[in-house]
Amino acid sequence: MKHKLKTRVQSELELSFLAEVKKYDNVLNATKFISRNQHKIMTTGRGLRATRIFTRQTILGISLDKILPRPTKYTHLDLFNWDVVSLAAFARNILEGYLSFHYFGIEDISDEEAELRFFILQLHRNIEWFEIRKLNNEDNLDDFEKGIPEQKERIKNHPFLSSLSKYQQGLAIKGLEMYKTKQNFEESLLICKDLRRDYRLLSNLVHPLPIAIERIDDEKGRGVGSDADISFSLLCLMVARKYLAATTVGMVDFFQERFSDKKYSASIALIRELMSE
């Protein structure tokens, strides 16, 4: 005689989260499909960086998927680990990845501006390696000590630098990886219209700051599926889904020749609306 499993009534909030999980699954499946078929792309420079960042986004998307709670009417919420901190960390990483994907890869800019961005990227990389090796008490740092000032001068004298605002020029000369601010992204990309709000919330959940710490009590922040944790998990997943979808759509649109076949366009058509929904 078979025993009938007891069921429970799932809350509207839980069902909303599970509906978002389905949307994320659709985006991730399309992302993995495109990722598996990007190997024939022949590109250099910005295109090459775009493919590398896309690969990174794919891996992040898969890793996030592995920690998603997937409760059913037959399972209790506390059987799953509702890890808001890790979900927020993955979501913020995917958000940042999209900004880099756009800025360093697919954004339509002049060759002159692309060259300046490349020079700044090189400077940023060398400054970071110099500081890491210096803190590690390594010898033979002469090339860095000589090269970094020379790179800064090259940026200062670059013909495109004067096209930037004074504030952006300062960021460029310092070697910050991007001279576009979050506000710049909000003003130029519809996908980023809530960028500063989303980034600030995710950052406060990721770091051990008052907003993240003070919310922890006997129910919230313990991973047991409280309404508050489900709500934050839903918000994190919505951000991750939106920016992962934007990355994948951007990849296909940028490399149109490679992904012109109907099997790709059909897959992407399903997730275009998930960039903003």
Regions found by a protein language model. Give the residues of each.
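A cross-kingdom marker of C-terminal helix-rich interaction/assembly modules
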Residues: 1-277
